[in-house]
């Protein structure tokens, strides 16, 4: 940026008269020019326009931004010049402006006004609203690259975004509309992609302008949304599970959009925080702005430098679904890490690992200070970022493969919970959590195990505190559920703790029935608590927690949690029935609690049975799929291993080297595909069936260990088949 200079400009003190004279007499010359790194830009009406906007439009914007933010010593020249020209434009008489040749008129944005009437231009898409009686709700709400953005309101109060062309970008809105039409026709509409209606003539100030109309998404951009979400996490308004589960929900939605675009053969090319808007009403993320789209394999019209995939800057590699996947992950990284606070860090550079020094520095109170883009330990999150941003295009997963990554398939929360969290984030209705948000550690589980053993010892001596042990068990169920989701405790320790909990329930049941040890001498006194006190302090909190659990959507990984909750309800019923039989008449309050416990147990049993049946069905499908792979699995595995061991290393350099590398890769791919040619259809059909099943099975630990083994075998076979299926479209 040190080479920036102003060329052909008037002094900062240029008068309005001089500005008028320059406009009228020297229209053929640039009004003001910048020269940045040998590239020329014009200063027009307080805007800087690249003379060739299709060669890195966003790249120049970053550099010029420094001039107008006061970071350059000579920024005042550009500012004063454009302020003066702006004033001259406003005060120039209509007669003078009409004499200005079209070239200069267009330079100042004064393009000829359309003669078409207000309303749709041509046939709008199906479902488009009636524009009769429309009015301008907001003008220039924000500017989007090559467009002005205004909000139009119909007589039915529907708000539409009007994307209006600037003169320098004439024709790009029609191309964008054609892209949406193509997507809708070939792949259909998508709830997380902007809903476009067509081109229309709309009011804009005292003019009429042609605009691309689409539904307004009322909400926040990605950076603001995730920054507020992170603040809620830090303030204890949501816990770690909710925060990361919501991040994963967003990632799944965005990758579903890139997969949808790929089905239509379209690449977005400009997914970034500013082009993802979160709907305040639904909590859903919506991808907008197809202005820089291309067809798969074509060179992109442009991109945002700090987010783009590296292959788009080397040789002649075209845009692809994988470059859009790269954009999704760099966008998420930017928002999660808070890169907007440090513009020198680029999200497409990925995470930087530091092992020679602490990844976090401490403040004066000894608390860690987050350093954006720095990782000191490997986690599923860091592996996800590295597996997509840190590999070449041929090794990068596509949308469906990325969704199968351990980071996105483990520790998820149900969609409705994630959307509610986002809606609360957008409306500012988050309330602090009262629960402990710290992670469950192995030490914590050992402490809880020791507490259970103490209760078991008390039972052996007929001194069991029934209320105390049931209250502790309720707390331990929550802790074990959380530990299983977080994945920070060894699987064997989790299994041991689960067994100890179930054993404690059996001991309580025997104790209540008077069969602990020598049943002939056992006591039937189960608790010093009065019935009412027991129900209010022990039964009620457990019922409320389990009822919330029942209202959620569950996956196979929740079966263990539901089994434990079912056992807890059974034990509470057993204890309460026994208390009710000790001499005094049963009160209406006790009947009420017994009925609520019984109803909750029935509902839980139904949900558990349904989930177990679905798991059995999935297990049967899994077995069938693995058997189907028998005809091709060994041949495909060996062919892929040979391809990986013989293919040349990716070279980055000149166009010539890139072309040579692609030729060599194509040759190796052709040999590999020939080896498995008779199984191509089988493998393609296999992945169509296996990928949805793998998403359903997830990556979390399951109670059925044999099912886990079969699931991982299916995952390996799917990876082999999917990679071979991609070879032709990637290299040939």
UniProtKB/Swiss-Prot annotation:
PANTHER family: OVARIAN-SPECIFIC SERINE/THREONINE-PROTEIN KINASE LOK-RELATED (PTHR44167), PROTEIN CBG02007 (PTHR44167:SF31). This is Protein kinase YpkA. It is found in: Secreted. ATP binds at residues 142-150, 163. It comes from the Bacteria. It catalyses: L-seryl-[protein] + ATP = O-phospho-L-seryl-[protein] + ADP + H(+); L-threonyl-[protein] + ATP = O-phospho-L-threonyl-[protein] + ADP + H(+). The gene is ypkA. The active site is at residue 270. Acts as a virulence determinant. It is an enzyme of class 2 (transferase). One of its GO terms (molecular function) is protein serine kinase activity. One of its GO terms (cellular component) is cytoplasm. Transmembrane segments: none annotated. Pfam families: Pkinase, Rac1. Keywords: ATP-binding, Kinase, Nucleotide-binding, Plasmid, Secreted, Serine/threonine-protein kinase, Signal, Transferase, Virulence. Its EC number is 2.7.11.1. Residues 136-408 form the Protein kinase domain. Belongs to the protein kinase superfamily. Ser/Thr protein kinase family.
């Amino acid at each position: 940026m040190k080479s920036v200079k102003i060329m052909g400009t008037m002094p900062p003190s240029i008068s309005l008269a001089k500005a008028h004279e320059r406009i009228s007499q020297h229209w053929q010359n640039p009004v003001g020019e910048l020269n940045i790194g040998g590239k020329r830009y014009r200063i027009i009406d307080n805007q800087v326009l690249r003379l060739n906007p299709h060669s890195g439009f966003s790249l120049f914007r970053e550099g010029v931004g420094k001039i107008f933010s006061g970071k350059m010593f000579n920024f005042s020249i550009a500012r004063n010049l454009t302020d003066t020209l702006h004033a001259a434009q406003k005060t120039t008489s209509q007669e003078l402006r009409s004499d200005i040749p079209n070239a200069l008129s267009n330079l100042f944005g004064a393009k000829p006004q359309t003669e078409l009437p207000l309303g749709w231009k041509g046939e709008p898409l199906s479902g488009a609203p009636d524009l009769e009686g429309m009015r301008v709700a907001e003008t220039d709400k924000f500017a989007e690259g090559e467009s002005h953005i205004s909000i139009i309101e119909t007589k039915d109060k529907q708000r539409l975004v009007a994307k209006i062309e600037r003169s320098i970008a004439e024709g790009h809105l029609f191309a964008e509309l054609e892209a949406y039409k193509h997507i809708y026709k070939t792949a259909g509409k998508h709830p997380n992609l902007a809903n476009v209606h067509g081109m229309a003539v709309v009011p804009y100030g005292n003019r009429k302008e042609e605009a691309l109309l689409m539904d307004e998404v009322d909400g926040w951009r990605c950076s603001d949304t995730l920054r507020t979400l992170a603040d809620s996490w830090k303030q204890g308004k949501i816990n770690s599970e909710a925060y990361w589960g919501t991040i994963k929900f967003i990632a799944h939605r965005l990758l579903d959009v890139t997969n949808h675009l790929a089905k239509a053969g379209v690449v977005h090319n400009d997914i970034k925080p500013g082009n993802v808007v979160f709907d305040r009403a639904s909590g859903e993320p919506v991808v907008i702005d197809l202005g820089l789209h291309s067809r798969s394999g074509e060179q992109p019209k442009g991109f945002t430098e700090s987010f783009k995939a590296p292959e788009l800057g080397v040789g002649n590699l075209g845009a692809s679904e994988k470059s859009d996947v790269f954009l999704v992950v760099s966008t998420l990284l930017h928002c999660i890490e808070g890169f907007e606070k440090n513009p020198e860090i680029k999200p497409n550079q990925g995470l930087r690992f530091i092992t020679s020094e602490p990844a976090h520095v401490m403040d004066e109170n000894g608390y860690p200070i987050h350093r954006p883009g720095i990782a000191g330990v490997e986690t599923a999150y860091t592996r996800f970022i590295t597996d997509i941003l840190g590999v070449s295009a041929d090794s990068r997963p596509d949308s469906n493969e990325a969704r199968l990554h351990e980071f996105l398939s483990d520790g998820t929360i149900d969609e409705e919970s994630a959307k509610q969290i986002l809606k609360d984030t957008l409306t500012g209705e988050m309330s602090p959590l009262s629960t402990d948000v710290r992670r469950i550690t192995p030490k914590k589980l050992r402490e809880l195990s020791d507490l259970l053993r103490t209760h078991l010892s008390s039972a052996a001596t007929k001194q069991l505190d029934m209320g105390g042990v049931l209250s502790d068990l309720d707390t331990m169920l929550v802790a074990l559920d959380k530990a299983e989701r977080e994945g920070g405790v060894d699987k064997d320790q989790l299994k041991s703790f689960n067994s100890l909990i179930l054993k404690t329930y059996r001991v309580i049941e025997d104790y209540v029935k008077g069969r602990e040890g020598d049943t002939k001498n056992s006591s039937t006194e189960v608790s010093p608590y009065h019935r009412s006190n027991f129900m209010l302090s022990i039964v009620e909190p457990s019922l409320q927690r389990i009822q919330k659990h029942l209202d959620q959507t569950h996956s196979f990984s929740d079966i263990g949690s539901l089994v434990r909750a079912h056992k807890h309800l059974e034990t509470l019923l057993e204890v309460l029935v026994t208390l009710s039989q000790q001499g005094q008449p049963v009160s209406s309050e006790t009947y009420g609690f017994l009925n609520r416990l019984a109803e909750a147990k029935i509902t839980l049993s139904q949900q558990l049975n349904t989930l177990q049946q679905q798991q059995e069905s999935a297990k049967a499908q899994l077995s069938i799929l693995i058997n189907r792979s028998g005809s091709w699995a060994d041949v495909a595995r060996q062919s892929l291993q040979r391809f990986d061991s013989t293919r040349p290393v990716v070279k980055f350099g000149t166009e010539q080297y890139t072309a040579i590398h692609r030729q060599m890769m194509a040759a190796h791919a052709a040999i590999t595909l020939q080896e498995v040619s008779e199984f191509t259809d089988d493998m393609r059909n296999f992945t169509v069936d296996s990928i949805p099943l793998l998403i359903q099975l997830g990556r979390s630990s399951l109670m059925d260990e044999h099912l886990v083994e079969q699931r991982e075998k299916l995952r390996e076979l799917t990876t082999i088949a999917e990679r071979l299926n991609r070879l032709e479209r990637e290299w040939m």
